[in-house]
Regions:
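Weak global preference for isoleucine
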Residues: 8, 18, 38-40, 62, ...
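Major-groove DNA-recognition helix of helix-turn-helix-type DNA-binding domains
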Residues: 18-44
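A short, Lys/Arg-enriched interface patch at domain edges and termini
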Residues: 50-71
C-alpha cells in the first residue's frame, strides 16, 4: 500500500507556490514534459513527483524548461 505522501495531490497553483514561481511557468514545465501531471478535472501533480523533480534538476538552470542547462 502506498504511503500517505504519495497520495497528496497539488493543483498547478499549489505547485507554483511550492516552487515559488507562477502558474504559467508550471504549465510550461508540464508542456515540456519535465513535470508530469494527471488531469482530474484540472491538472494535479503528486507530492512525490514534485519532490523527485526538484532532486532531478538540482544544479540545473531550468528557466527555459525546453532548454535545460547544467550549472
Amino acid at each position: 500500500m502506498a504511503n500517505e505522501s504519495t497520495n497528496i495531490l497539488y493543483t498547478v497553483k499549489e505547485a507554483a507556490g511550492i516552487l515559488k514561481t507562477n502558474v504559467a511557468y508550471v504549465h510550461r514545465l508540464r508542456q515540456s514534459g519535465k513535470l508530469r501531471f494527471i488531469k482530474i478535472g484540472q491538472f494535479k501533480v503528486r507530492k512525490e513527483t514534485l519532490e523527485n523533480f526538484l532532486k532531478e534538476f538540482e544544479g540545473c538552470d531550468i528557466t527555459d524548461p525546453f532548454k535545460v542547462i547544467q550549472l
